[in-house]
Every structure is written in structure tokens, then in C-alpha cells.
């Protein structure tokens, strides 16, 4: 009996050690000026934001989270009140974040991967664009002028992001992140009705599908691209050939009207004669 007890204990210990030895990523760092506040680790899934873990910060502001290594690049965020820091995870890496309670979402420092450095750059670019758009909305410019300025700002932003982040490295997690940034709650890149934007989604979808063909994000992005391509495809113009005996040449538009006696007359019946047509509208 005692031997069986020892055996069971050993098996349980081995199982617990195996669980602790599973590949995992780590997120750690400090948040200054946030004593007694709750810091949340959240998963940015395809279905929405999912809470993973949380900690109440002490005076030191140190925190440590961990999670199972994803099978393909995935996205998480740290949330303090209504401020968030976005980051990606694609291995057993350790992401180190240093931030302050004020400016938590933009003035943070992140170490651990190129992807997260680039994601921060994109966050700052988007924040700058949002600030310019807010100022434009308060400028008092005529609606037409303000709209033209808005289009110029957004197009300049998109050109910069396309060139430096999406087409430059479509296989990177930050390229995927760039596709889904928002302005005033709306996606900056349009995956459904903009032919040029669909090309950006297609570039990233192709790379993801090659690297992670079974990942949910790969399939979701691929389906989005297919729908966008269908929506933006130029309609094909088909030539219609009519039989020669069905074609009649006419130098005038034929009009069929009734006279005062109710008799029908066709304009072509009066060919060669001088005809005055009077159109009168009655209200």
C-alpha cells in the first residue's frame, strides 16, 4: 500500500513538472506610478479580447506573466485602466516592458523582438495620425476642404505603412498588425472595397499561408482576401453579336403617337416630309 502511495505521488510530481516545463512565453517588466492598480494580460483573439491573467501592482510596479507558446504568431496586450500596450508572441521569447502610469500606451519601452519594436512604431504613427485628424475636425475649415485634407493625411499614412511595414516584410507579425489599425473606430486599410488595400492584405495572407497554413489567422485572412478580390474585381464586358437581319439603320429616333382622332402614327412613316413635333408638359 505504501509503495503504491509513493508511486502515485511520484506520478503526480512528474505530471506537475511536465506542466511547468511546457514551452511558454513570458511578459515581465515594471509600471511606475501605478501602485494598487490592476494590470491585465489580455489575448487579442479573432473572436475578441480575452482576459488571460492579472496582477495588482505594488510600489515597485514589477509584474510577471506567462502563457503557453502559440503554434503561430499571436497577439496580446497589457491593459492599465483604459490604456493598452500591444505586442506579439511567436515563440518562447521573453517580452520586457517598462512603462509609466502616465503615457502608458505610447511612452513605453519594449524589448524582446523586432516585431514588438515595429508594433510600437506603428502605434506611434497611428497616434500621430489620430491627433492630426482631431485637430482637423476642430479647425473650422469648410467641409469640402476638411475632407480633402483628411484624405491626404490618411493616404500619406497608408503609403508610408505599405512601403515600410507591409510590403517590406509581409511575413512578419507587425505587417499583420498594421493591416488592422483603426482611425476613429474604423479600419484604415479597407479589406473589402479598396482594390489597392486588398493587395496589402493579399501580400500578408500569402506569406502567412505559406508559413502557417493551418493557423486560424491564416485562414481568416485568406478568406477576407478572397471576398475583397471578388468585391473589387472589374466586371467583364461581353460583346453581343446581333444577326444582320435584325439590325436596321435609322437616321431618326422613331416615335409612336396618337392623333386627335386616336389614330396611331409613327414618325418613320413620315420620312421625307417636314414634321413639327410639339412636346407639351402638363402639371
Predicted regions and their residues:
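N-proximal helix/coil linker or "cap" segments that precede and/or mark the start of modular domains
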Residues: 198-254, 258, 268-270
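Helix-turn-helix repeat elements of alpha-solenoid scaffolds
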Residues: 152-159, 194-202
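A non-transmembrane, solvent-exposed segment enriched in polar/low-complexity residues
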Residues: 19-169
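Amphipathic alpha-helical repeat scaffolds of TPR domains
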Residues: 171-187
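Short coil/turn connectors between adjacent alpha-helices in alpha-solenoid helical repeat scaffolds
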Residues: 148-149, 187-197
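Structural signature of alpha-solenoid helical repeat scaffolds
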Residues: 170, 193-196, 213
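Short active-site neighborhood of thiol/selenol oxidoreductases, capturing the structured segment around
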Residues: 263-283
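Bacterial Sec-dependent N-terminal signal peptides
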Residues: 1-30, 281
Amino acid at each position: 500500500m505504501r509503495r503504491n502511495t509513493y508511486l502515485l505521488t511520484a506520478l503526480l510530481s512528474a505530471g506537475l513538472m511536465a506542466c511547468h516545463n511546457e514551452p511558454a512565453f513570458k511578459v515581465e517588466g515594471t509600471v511606475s506610478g501605478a501602485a494598487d492598480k490592476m494590470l491585465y494580460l489580455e489575448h487579442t483573439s479573432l473572436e475578441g479580447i480575452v482576459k488571460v491573467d492579472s496582477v495588482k501592482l505594488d510600489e515597485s510596479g514589477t509584474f510577471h506573466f506567462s502563457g503557453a507558446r502559440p503554434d503561430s504568431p499571436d497577439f496580446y496586450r497589457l491593459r492599465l485602466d483604459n490604456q493598452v500596450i500591444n505586442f506579439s508572441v511567436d515563440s518562447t521569447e521573453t517580452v520586457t516592458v517598462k512603462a509609466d502610469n502616465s503615457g502608458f500606451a505610447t511612452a513605453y519601452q519594449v524589448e524582446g523582438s523586432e516585431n514588438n519594436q515595429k508594433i510600437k512604431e506603428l502605434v506611434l504613427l497611428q497616434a500621430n495620425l489620430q491627433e492630426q485628424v482631431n485637430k482637423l475636425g476642430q479647425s473650422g475649415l469648410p467641409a469640402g476642404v476638411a475632407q480633402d485634407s483628411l484624405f491626404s493625411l490618411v493616404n500619406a499614412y497608408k503609403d508610408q505603412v505599405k512601403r515600410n511595414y507591409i510590403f517590406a516584410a509581409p511575413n512578419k507579425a507587425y505587417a499583420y498588425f498594421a493591416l488592422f489599425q483603426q482611425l476613429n473606430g474604423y479600419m484604415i486599410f479597407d479589406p473589402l472595397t479598396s482594390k489597392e488595400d486588398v493587395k496589402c492584405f493579399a501580400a500578408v495572407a500569402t506569406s502567412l499561408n505559406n508559413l502557417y497554413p493551418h493557423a486560424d489567422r491564416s485562414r481568416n485572412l485568406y478568406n477576407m482576401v478572397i471576398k475583397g478580390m471578388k468585391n473589387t474585381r472589374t466586371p467583364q464586358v461581353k460583346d453581343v453579336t446581333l444577326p444582320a437581319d435584325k439590325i436596321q439603320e435609322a437616321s431618326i429616333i422613331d416615335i409612336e403617337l396618337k392623333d386627335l382622332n386616336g389614330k396611331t402614327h409613327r414618325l418613320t412613316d413620315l420620312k421625307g416630309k417636314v414634321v413639327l413635333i410639339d412636346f407639351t408638359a402638363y402639371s
